[in-house]
């Protein structure tokens, strides 16, 4: 995707401005890690390349994945190959769990959420980040998009209580991201011309995002849920 190339030359403040979803995701994982007791067991379900490991250096971090999502990724940091619908762990052994932009890639999301609930200890918490309006990615393993209501339903059915559920941006941040998406259709000499047309409005639009009060047009959601004691 175009973002991998863009991130290499963007200064930090501009990365946060243009690629807001990515920045919010990183903040959410870092902040979540800060709430977990030192030494506690943490499951990263659908960890991919385990790039969030840096935030859990003081925990017993267990990244698992089925390793079929992207054939360009390096899965060597994964501790176990695991089908998220049947996690290879006893019940109630993790203090916390992550499921970061992974739930759209599973055919049985309810079973996955229920498995996360099963392996959490009473009082344990799970951080989920899910897409709402997003392009197809990691095809053909891309099955679902989620509304706030659908996510609440999945969590409720698994016996989890929602503590936090927040949209990541509104209409104008969504449109900014979509303009950047458009750069991928241009090559050679047409690319700088397209960049001149698409990047300036992409820079301006996020400043208008406060106009969207409901945030029904959003890139995705960050959610924290707890297993009852």
What do the PLM-derived regions correspond to, one by one?
Residues 110-111, 115, 119-121, 125-228:
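S-adenosyl-L-methionine-dependent methyltransferase catalytic module, highlighting the catalytic core
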Residues 88-90, 107, 147:
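GHKL-family ATP-binding catalytic core of two-component histidine kinases
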Residues 1-92, 96-100, 113, 218-221, ...:
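Conserved N-terminal segment of class I S-adenosyl-L-methionine
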Residues 101-105:
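Short catalytic micro-motifs in class I SAM-dependent methyltransferases
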Residues 51-53, 107, 136:
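Glycine/Thr-rich phosphate-binding loops of Rossmann-like dinucleotide-binding domains
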């Amino acid at each position: 995707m175009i973002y991998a190339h863009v991130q290499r030359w963007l200064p930090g403040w501009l990365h946060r401005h243009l690629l807001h979803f990515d920045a919010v995701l990183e903040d959410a994982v870092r902040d979540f890690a800060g709430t977990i007791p030192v030494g506690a067991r943490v499951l990263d379900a659908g960890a991919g390349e385990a790039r969030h490991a840096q935030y859990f250096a003081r925990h017993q971090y267990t990244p698992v994945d089925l390793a079929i999502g992207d054939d360009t990724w390096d899965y060597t940091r994964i501790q176990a190959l695991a089908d998220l619908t049947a996690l290879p762990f006893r019940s109630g052994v993790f203090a916390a769990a992550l499921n970061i932009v992974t739930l759209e890639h599973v055919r049985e999301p309810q079973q996955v959420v229920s498995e996360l609930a099963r392996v959490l200890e009473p009082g344990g918490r799970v951080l989920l980040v899910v897409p709402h309006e997003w392009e197809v990615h990691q095809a053909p393993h891309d099955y679902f998009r989620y509304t706030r209501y659908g996510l609440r339903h999945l969590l409720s059915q698994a016996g989890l209580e929602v503590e936090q559920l927040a949209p990541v941006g509104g209409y104008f941040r969504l449109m900014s991201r979509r303009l950047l998406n458009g750069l991928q259709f241009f090559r050679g000499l047409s690319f700088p011309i397209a960049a001149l047309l698409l990047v300036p409005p992409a820079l301006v639009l996020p400043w208008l995002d406060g106009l969207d009060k409901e945030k029904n047009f959003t890139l995705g959601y960050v959610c924290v849920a707890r297993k009852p004691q």
